Amino acid sequence: MGVTVDVHQVFQYPFEQVVACFLRKYPNPMDKNVISVKTVEEKKDESTGLIYRKRIAICQNVVPEILRKVSILKVPDIQLEEESWLSLQKRNMAIRSHCLTWTQYASMREESVFRESVENPNWTEFIQTGRISITGAGFLNCILETFASTFLRQGAQKGIRIMEMLLKEQCGSPLVE
């Protein structure tokens, strides 16, 4: 089965400011679930200017305690891998992330893009699609997917609120035209 979450947001800030804010977003006291984010690889293609980054995020295990009675869910934290491709020239950044924990039982993938808005070149559009599919937990599959869907939606909205707050703090009021 699986569940999908789609998010679309326009930040009324220029692309470069939004991307810089995204890359510095975590850890953040507004989201205690993200413990750390570490860049493990970064390289620039000199011919195209494309910047590739691979980061590993360590997050708290947010699975409810009652479900952690199942041994496979009883882990202290969850690791996510994020890869991004930033083109300052084209003013877009593509991001792919997936869960490194529970890979034999679950698949969690997100694909995101930050790009210059077609509405206004001083704004930035954010589009994200996330999909979670649980396969190895028997009768718990449906329960875990429902929980994951709710958590993903809330997490996406929280991430947008954090971005808006950080952008306002670091760059001032949004560019309204």
Swiss-Prot record:
Signal peptide: none
Top-level taxon in the UniProt lineage: Eukaryota
InterPro entries: PRELI/MSF1_dom, Slowmo/Ups
Organism: Mus musculus (Mouse)
One cellular component (GO) term of this entry: mitochondrial intermembrane space
Stated name of the protein: PRELI domain-containing protein 2
One Pfam family linked to the record: PRELI
Gene name of this polypeptide: Prelid2
Lineage: Eukaryota, Metazoa, Chordata, Craniata, Vertebrata
Domain PRELI/MSF1: 1-175
